[in-house]
Regions:
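N-terminal ligand-binding lobe of clamshell/alpha-beta domains
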Residues: 1-264
Length: 264
């Protein structure tokens, strides 16, 4: 007897579908989760920004970007489940997809919401045991995470204009879990920042993220000139902003960051 899988997503939208066999993922961090859940044979489409696992760029259909879907490609794949995210995708595109396909959307700011997403997707895809194991390991590794001293930190994720990660973001949640103080805690989302504002914030540590703006060593001095006393570090943006199974690797990465800051 055929049965349905039922799930309510983070928008409180309920979907009831046959166990999915043709999945399209619209978000890089959730694409990696699908791989870690062992769904290689059931994922048929990903975005051009879905870089993990690397081999999927060669074996899966690329359906465009996270904010510009190629609807003809998606339609040709005949998906029975599309998985997206409120922040990373665009409402107009999601509404259009929902006219034809089941769409499950995440909306993640808090740590527990990330774990809930992993649990929900594992239930939808009948990989509950693997999902539970991933969640259990993430929780254990974060519980063992040594906290940073309460240093004032600024996380920059864009240049020209400068933009930082403030309250109401998953990045802010991760910064706080490390023990650091986000100097943009009183702001919301991703505020634009002038050089004078950055000086006024007076962070002790500045993280230059690898994404979405690809900060590299040539930008270190530019920020150092604004904040001569601060420690400026290039960081892997995936470790701060990816809310899927990449969280398995974040605690070990933060230990390395402690060493880079000279914190034993």
């Amino acid at each position: 007897m055929k049965y349905k899988v039922v799930s309510t997503d983070h928008r409180n939208t309920r979907i009831e579908i046959d166990p999915p066999q043709r999945i399209v993922s619209l978000v890089p961090s959730q694409t990696e989760l699908l791989f870690d859940l062992g769904l290689d044979d059931r994922v048929v489409g990903i975005t051009k920004f879905c870089v993990r696992p690397e081999k999927w760029k060669k074996t899966k259909a690329v359906i465009g970007g996270t904010k510009n879907f190629h609807f003809d490609v998606i339609e040709s794949l005949h998906p029975d489940l599309i998985i997206g995210n409120k922040e990373e995708n665009y409402e107009e595109g999601i509404v259009r997809l929902e006219e034809f396909f089941p769409v499950w959307m995440s909306d993640i700011v808090e740590f527990q919401q990330a774990l809930d997403m992993i649990r929900s997707i594992s239930l939808l895809t009948q990989t509950e045991r693997k999902g539970a194991a991933i969640i259990d390991t993430i929780e254990k590794r974060f519980k063992r995470l040594y906290q940073f001293p309460p240093l004032r930190a600024l996380y920059l994720m864009w240049r020209n204009p400068w933009m930082g990660a403030a309250n109401g973001t998953f990045i802010n949640t991760i910064i706080k879990r490390t023990g650091l103080i986000n100097v943009l805690e009183d702001e919301m989302r991703y505020p634009e920042l002038s050089a004078s504002k950055i000086k006024e914030l007076d962070p002790r540590v500045v993280f230059l993220s690898s994404e979405p703006f690809p900060f590299n060593p040539k930008y270190l001095q530019e920020v150092q000139d604004i904040l001569p006393r601060a420690k400026i570090l290039l960081v892997d943006g995936e470790m701060f902003s990816w809310y899927g199974s990449r969280l398995l690797h974040a605690p070990a990465y933060f230990r390395k960051l402690r060493e880079m800051l000279g914190i034993v």
